[in-house]
């Protein structure tokens, strides 16, 4: 059952400010309404005790604080009567004025009190108890407070929301109105974060049209940000940027060229010429890739002392574990120990885990302090299970915290490095440039760095192509495991994964196999079959839990066989509405107790508890199940493997149903059974690495529902999604010959 709320309007006087977060403006007020005292919560860019306000919002219930009025918009009414003036001044909003002084000011000046407070300290000093010096301070306090108020009122009249007003004031100070009036496009800067299209509207509503150069510069940065955060490009070829920006901004390429140079001189962009062509970066993207390049070279210059009896140590491990390493596996172990830095790559069944365990055993025998890390919670959990040693997410390892602009920073950094002597990092293909730069900066000099990944998978959701660029640079030791071991050769999942990588036709004709293709010619038929497999056939035949064991992976969100439509169908089948299941609407989504959900963006602020510990942070791609919805408090309790997190209603806008997810979102996870629609795949997603990534998510069973022709077409298309990045170029462009000459295996 669900609960809905209608918007209400409440008028009253602010009696008390019970809590205020100065960083984001979140405030808890006590508001007097007639004879009642209510609690109001929301974003207030500026508010004072004694003010008369009109609040628009809805009633909610908090488990700890009870009934609250959640404010979505508000208007303030300036005190008009002498009684309202007294209440406002007596509340202590202005420094130097208490109850007695407030009474004397109102008695002397009446309804014109604010006029004297604003500009006439000489008259104010005639009030008993106020010296000329005190009058100056009182007037200064009043002007300061009402300057902020005037600023926010002006900005809000331009169509800028309370949260954005606060961010703009924090970024630009008391001159913010002047800055915004002259150049509204400063609102596009990351520390404020107003989207470019909205700023265009704001600019149209200003009294005077701003200088067009401001617009063009902001448009150039907007294009680069979109390419960075949406498409993963860390840079764009300059000629392409000029062409795209000129068309987008309805100007000419020469003007864009001049503005790009100016942005570079202002240290907002970087333009760098490499051997092939010139590329343009946002300043932070360039710094991240340059930092990675520099730190890699530093680590290469601090190799560990060689191990004299390595062959005998490897033989001891083989005897103890009753195994026999292949030559490439031995090479990987020796390289990890002697070089101190290694990329270990290879597909399923090639022995990466066995090799990793050997490296770990040798590091432990040397008495090294070892840390294990992975980009996601699921990948870290799997790493822990495979090695028997705790692995942490990179964010947790680096001890994430917030800066003054609510952006994540890390306690562990170049000034406060990690205390480990060896770091083993899994799923490197998922790690973007920003996170990898932060991780490398936190490594102490001499720390060994072992990186595992599969370069045939999709690039990371974030910016860059770290694993690919590191391998292609040929600057680091790389061992690629290709031999499929006997125990994996019976698996068609493993066999077909390697056939896909080689562009060969998959094998699906074994009835007792673990890989099946079910021919369906249309998306509608594919969706119908997927629903039957998910809800009925696989649970009955394999005793699989639909929620915990089966995952539908789609190339895209759209279409009848996309995640949006399939999630609606699967939710109705495996978790239909019920009188004993609470529901909650958040944004445009309906969530129900028992739903499978996914976090779709990093949130470093959500609290979670487990049997062993508690912490903050649920990250992009984490999958959980809604265990309970409390309608009174409008909160949901969601289990993410061994952690339980509590979500407020507004935080649930960061969730999506996860019965079906995109292949991109599945990176770093494994599932007992995977079902994938492959029918009418759009050309932009008809790639080999997307199909390969989906297949390698399956541990026990892989079912493709679609057409063989479409599967063949995807497997044949080895053109990987184009990503502009400069890491490889930076690694090679200024690499010293001595370093290049010492990194071969």
Predicted regions and their residues:
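Accessory, non-ATPase domains that flank or precede helicase/AAA+ motor cores in DNA-metabolism machines
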Residues: 1-312, 745
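Conserved helicase motor core of P-loop NTPases
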Residues: 455-616, 627
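Conserved pre-motif I regulatory segment
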Residues: 312-340
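Loop/turn positions that initiate beta-strands
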Residues: 50-52, 594, 621
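C-terminal accessory regions
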Residues: 620-745
